[in-house]
A protein has these predicted regions:
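Charge-dense, helix-prone N-terminal extensions
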Residues: 21-38, 59-61, 124, 145-150
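Charged, low-complexity, helix/coiled-coil-prone segments
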Residues: 13-23, 49-64, 149-150
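Extreme N-terminal tail/first-helix region
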Residues: 2-37, 93
């Protein structure tokens, strides 16, 4: 619940009420979510939804996602930059509206991984540890997802 200040009577001292404001499913809600569903297009035209971890990029309305370099989502993004994103839970159940986006493969950086460690904390560190143990850390691909202007 977000509180909004609202004057009651201007003639006397100004009093403020707490008025709940219900936010629409906007970029703000997407940015504060733990996961979003990344919808990518296959060569046959069908679409695949994948729940992913993400962090905001320095650019406005842009996020970073990482995946295994051989994963289906990376292959699909190589073929089609068109994507859609929506807020979701850990299992991929969509909780918000789909928003058109553009996805591209980019080079990874330590700063981006530091942002993932900061956002996801211990869970990411455990995931990262086992990734290093299995040698999978060398097979990561960073994806930049930019929400299309409305």
């Amino acid at each position: 619940m977000i509180l909004r200040q609202q004057p009651v009577d201007l003639k006397t001292s100004i009093q403020w009420l707490a008025v709940p404001v219900i936010l629409s499913d906007s970029l703000m809600q997407l940015a504060t979510a733990q996961y979003f569903s990344l919808r990518t297009k296959k060569k046959d035209g069908s679409q695949v939804d994948t729940p992913v971890w993400f962090v905001p990029a320095p650019e406005e309305q842009t996020y970073h996602v990482f995946a295994n370099i051989g994963s289906g989502k990376v292959k699909r993004i190589r073929n089609f930059a068109e994507a859609y994103v929506a807020r979701c839970d850990i299992r991929g159940k969509v909780l918000g509206e789909w928003q058109a986006a553009h996805a591209e493969l980019v080079a990874e950086s330590d700063a981006i991984y530091a942002t993932f460690r900061s956002k996801y904390g211990l869970i990411f560190r455990i995931f990262d540890f086992f990734s290093w143990l299995g040698g999978k850390h060398k097979e990561r691909q960073m994806i930049r997802v930019t929400i299309d202007a409305e």
